[in-house]
Amino acid sequence: MKRFTSMVLAALMILSLAACGDSTVTVTPDATPDSGSDAPAASGTAEYTIKVGHTLQEDTPSHKAFVVFKDEVEKNSDGRIAVELYPNSSLGSERVMFEACQMGTLEVAYGTTSVLANFDKNLEVLDLPFLFADEAAARAAVNGELGEAAAANLSEIGLLNLTYMENGIRHLMNNTRPVNTPDDVKGLKIRTMENPIHMSAFTQLGASPTPMAFTELFTALQQGTVDGNEQPIFLIKTSRFEEVQKYLSLTGHFYTAGIATINKAFFESLPEDLQTVVMDAADVAREAQYGYCDEDNISALEYLKTKMEVNEITPENHQLFVDATAPVYAEVEAEVGPEIMAIVRAAQAG
């Protein structure tokens, strides 16, 4: 339960929330949950209901992992908890769902730490460019001391870290040219998430970062509003970006962790035995999601190589990208302080 430890004053959290914008916190009342599995629905007789909202499609590793979560919770609670899954942005954007989870109108919200960092600056450290060499290193770090420190303040704003998952290592696409060096990025208008670290990194590379909701991205690429975007391999395929992007460069510039938050008051209202059921189910779902990601990334990359011009980055050119984005580390340290950055450097060192 260390992941739930509070580390900062509530006043600081209020300031963080003030930066979250004016998104309306709504949960669509007539959204239909995805049944997810063949397990019998228990909501009619259950003592508790956990609604889980996320933005991804039903065939993604994350949704499949939440099907596992649903099955584990309903089975091991003997039907005392029913789980309803709401994929595909049916309850709104990531930010809207995190806010709904904070307010208690949604029990569990899943999204990227990149978006949740708008609520808690410490989570920004997980978005640093070229932070991890590969998924194995990233998973070890976010499920260790670094991930614990990054999410420790969430309890001050009414959330708890149920579990980390992942969107994965991100790569760059565009319709102008292959990207081999930082010079190739200059002048490109790249859609980014609404995340200052991502935007700063692309600015350092000479691009024009353009934050945009994921739901608007495909149309923006079709219309040429932006030149390119960046996503994990499996998500490129499931979102059909090969239909609107010509070049895929395996830059590996960010690792995007996913995080499932649970409303603190709701979790603490559960009897201790059911708290354990929920936490254990989240652990099982996380490991399942990592496995699904590995499988999907392999098959998706093979498919994308038949649809796009794909290039790898040489070690020498990779270092050029690392050097070009190094100033972002100083920017983040000024935001979060040296203590958590020391944990970042220890995680990088392995």
Predicted segments with their positions:
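C-terminal motif of bacterial Sec signal peptides marking the signal peptidase cleavage site
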Residues: 16-19
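Conserved glycine-rich "GG(E/T)P / GGGxP" loop and the immediately following alpha-helix
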Residues: 151
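Positively charged n-region of N-terminal signal peptides that target proteins for export
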Residues: 1-4, 9
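N-terminal secretory/targeting leader peptides
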Residues: 21-31, 42-137, 146, 154-350
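Glycine-rich, low-complexity intrinsically disordered segments
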Residues: 38-40
